[in-house]
């Protein structure tokens, strides 16, 4: 355990025979036994050869005398050799001492101090092999984890040793160099001696380690650091114990209290400015930490009364800590304006209520539509959003001359948005009973004029009020001919009826109407004015032609195929001038076809009719 020290004690001593204490003479071949009373080692035996030193000075006969090592030396003295070892020799070879009190040869003390705010203690730090080992000032405990890291010990062995310690303090939070397992001073010295790192850690084990900070080379700096550490320690201790002595203000260089500042002003070692070493720089709002005279305007009235009426520095320190932790806003905003600004919120909430009334206003704008919803003709306008679009025909049992605006497509104009039987049943039902029966299905229109064009609301002409659904025959206009007498249009649109359903597509529904009266879009009606007054036999037909169905440009297919055959023949006649013989061959082929039928003719003719305009556009 201590063989490394044995080689430094030689046989060729310059003075007298070597006499060992009687307790160790019987243990010459073995390492010395550590005395439990002191926790260190006795003088080792000398069985090894000499060790040549470069300076040629003789080796001492034994360890240095305790009087030369200062208080705290626990090595036993050798009889008859008190005072024979000179001072320079003792200082030169004190690195081989296991007490760690004297510096190794040529080694300057390198120690730093830091304030451990979590524990409220000053810590001395010594760096060895890139590891910072700390020692507390209050109880002199040493960070055993960092100590064993200096020895290069593995983590498993280190943790096993530290867990076996009876007295230990585990620190898991805080700065990195302060975390670990803290062990007492004596146990740390034992570990350092076992691992032979005592001289590397000098001056960690020096008892009066704080005196090394006052080196003449850095006297001013060390004075500032120690004074700041002491005041910080007193401040943290006072904050933890509010009943502490009143003579310890937080910052002595501010005249906060008369008794505390006068008692501390007599200290000569105080620096002129040491606030930067005490705590981090406070925010700009904490100007009271720099100038107490100007801080009266930045503190709240309760603290003003406290600082003016009392001379207790601890209460002033409380106000200082509150001022340091305050943001910049309370430094410029008085409490009165803050309360006024908080009272300004209820009017804002009332303005939100007013804005809700603004959003409720469109409901009032929709009030003109409310009276019309009670009439039967408007029930088919506004109650249509829940049904699926269908390709079936219009309602079947309406009279031809009805004045309801939803009836202008009863006769032969199918609407693809209705869920009713096809138009075949339109002409035979004119009595009021079946008309009333069909009225039950009027709300099944799947289109609403509002969803297509909001500008159509100007054409929502309100018909004369209908008293009863079943008595619609009494409200038929007398100036209108029957529905069948309208010219070839095939529609029974009354002259006084509104047409709210504006853009219904006629795309693929079957209709027996002629191609000359195919309905076109409103855009073409406005631009070309083809519909005129001759469509429905009225001079004001253009007003109501806006409500006709929007055509998609396709010809209306008929089940018997007559319209498409007619168009195909017209196209063939037009094309016969350019391709006469091709047309003859094609007709001959079609006539010679033994399986020709109207279905086959219908399927072939639109192909020729569609292909021809493409060739003509070229």
Swiss-Prot record:
Biased composition (Basic and acidic residues): 438-451
Biological process per Gene Ontology, one example term: conidium formation
GO cellular component, one term: nucleus
Annotated region described as Disordered, given as residue ranges: 13-105, 229-355, 390-618
Keywords assigned: Conidiation, DNA-binding, Nucleus, Sporulation, Transcription, Transcription regulation, Virulence
UniProt keyword Nucleus, yes or no: yes
UniProt GO MF annotations: DNA-binding transcription factor activity; sequence-specific DNA binding
InterPro entries, alphabetized: EFG1/Phd1/StuA, HTH_APSES_sf, KilA/APSES_HTH, Tscrpt_reg_HTH_APSES-type
Annotated HTH APSES-type domain residues: 110-216
Biased composition (Polar residues): 13-28, 91-101, 256-266, 284-298, 305-326, 336-355, 452-476, 513-563
Reported phenotype of the disruption mutant: Leads to reduced conidiation and mycelial growth. Delays the transfer of conidial glycogen and lipid droplets and decreases efficiency of appressorium-mediated invasion of rice leaves.
DNA-binding region, residue intervals: 144-165
Cell compartments where the protein resides: Nucleus
Bias-annotated ranges (Low complexity): 48-59, 494-512
Region annotation (Nuclear localization domain) ranges: 566-588
Major location (coarse): nucleus
Entry keyword annotation includes Cytoplasm: no
Biological function: Transcription factor that regulates asexual reproduction. Binds the StuA-response elements (StRE) with the consensus sequence 5'-(A/T)CGCG(T/A)N(A/C)-3' at the promoters of target genes. Required for appressorium-mediated infection of rice leaves due to its involvement in the mobilization of lipids and glycogen.
Family: Belongs to the EFG1/PHD1/stuA family.
Name listed for the protein in its UniProt record: Cell pattern formation-associated protein STU1
Biological source species: Pyricularia oryzae (strain 70-15 / ATCC MYA-4617 / FGSC 8958)
Organismal lineage: Eukaryota, Fungi, Dikarya, Ascomycota, Pezizomycotina
């Amino acid at each position: 355990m201590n063989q490394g020290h044995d080689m430094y004690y030689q046989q060729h001593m310059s003075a007298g025979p070597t006499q060992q204490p009687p307790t160790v003479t019987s243990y010459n071949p073995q390492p010395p036994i550590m005395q439990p009373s002191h926790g260190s080692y006795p003088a080792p035996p000398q069985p090894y050869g000499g060790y040549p030193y470069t300076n040629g000075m003789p080796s001492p006969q034994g360890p240095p005398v305790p009087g030369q090592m200062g208080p705290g030396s626990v090595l036993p003295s050798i009889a008859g050799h008190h005072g024979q070892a000179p001072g320079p020799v003792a200082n030169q070879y004190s690195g081989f001492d296991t007490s760690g009190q004297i510096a190794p040869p040529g080694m300057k003390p390198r120690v730093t101090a830091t304030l451990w705010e979590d524990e409220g203690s000053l810590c001395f730090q010594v760096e060895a092999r890139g590891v910072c080992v700390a020692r507390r000032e209050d109880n002199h405990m040493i960070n055993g984890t960092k100590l064993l890291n200096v020895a290069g010990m593995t983590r498993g062995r280190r943790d096993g040793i530290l867990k076996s310690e009876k007295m230990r303090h585990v620190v898991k939070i805080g700065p990195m160099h302060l975390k670990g397992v803290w062990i007492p001073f004596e146990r740390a010295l034992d570990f350092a001696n076992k691992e032979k790192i005592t001289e590397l850690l000098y001056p960690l084990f020096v008892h009066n380690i704080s005196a090394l900070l006052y080196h003449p080379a850095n006297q001013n700096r060390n004075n500032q650091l120690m004074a700041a550490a002491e005041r910080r320690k007193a401040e943290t201790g006072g904050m933890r114990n509010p009943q502490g002595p009143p003579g310890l203000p937080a910052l002595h260089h501010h005249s906060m209290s008369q008794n505390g500042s006068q008692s501390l002003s007599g200290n000569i070692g105080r620096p002129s400015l040491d606030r930067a070493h005490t705590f981090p720089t406070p925010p700009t709002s904490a100007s009271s930490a720099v100038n107490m005279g100007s801080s009266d305007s930045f503190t709240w009235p309760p603290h003003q009364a406290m600082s003016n009426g009392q001379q207790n520095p601890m209460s002033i320190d409380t106000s200082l800590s509150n001022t340091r932790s305050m943001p910049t806003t309370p430094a410029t905003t008085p409490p009165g304006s803050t309360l006024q600004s908080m009272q300004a919120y209820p009017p804002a909430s009332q303005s939100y209520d007013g804005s809700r009334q603004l959003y409720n206003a469109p409901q009032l704008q929709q009030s003109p539509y409310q009276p019309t919803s009670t009439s039967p003709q408007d029930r088919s306008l506004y109650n249509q959003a829940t049904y699926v679009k269908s390709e079936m025909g219009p309602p079947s049992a309406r009279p031809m001359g009805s004045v309801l605006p939803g009836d202008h497509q009863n006769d032969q104009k199918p609407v693809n948005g209705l869920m009713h039987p096809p138009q075949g049943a339109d002409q035979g039902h004119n009595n009021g009973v079946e008309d009333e029966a069909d009225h039950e299905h009027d709300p099944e229109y799947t289109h609403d004029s509002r969803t297509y064009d909001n500008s159509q609301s100007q054409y929502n002409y309100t018909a004369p009020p209908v008293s009863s659904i079943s008595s619609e025959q009494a409200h038929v206009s007398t100036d209108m001919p029957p529905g069948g007498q309208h010219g070839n249009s095939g529609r029974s649109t009354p002259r006084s009826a509104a047409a709210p359903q504006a853009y219904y597509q006629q795309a693929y529904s079957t209709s027996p109407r002629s191609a000359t009266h195919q309905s076109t879009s409103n855009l073409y009606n406005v631009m070309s004015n083809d519909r005129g007054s001759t469509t429905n036999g009225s001079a004001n037909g253009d007003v109501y032609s806006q409500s006709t169905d929007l055509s998609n440009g396709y010809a209306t297919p008929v089940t018997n195929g007559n319209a498409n055959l007619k168009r195909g023949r017209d196209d063939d006649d037009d094309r016969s001038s350019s391709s006469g013989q091709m047309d003859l061959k094609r007709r001959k082929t079609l006539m010679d076809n033994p399986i020709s039928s109207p279905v086959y003719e219908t399927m072939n003719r639109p192909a020729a009719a569609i292909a021809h305009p493409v060739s003509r556009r070229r």
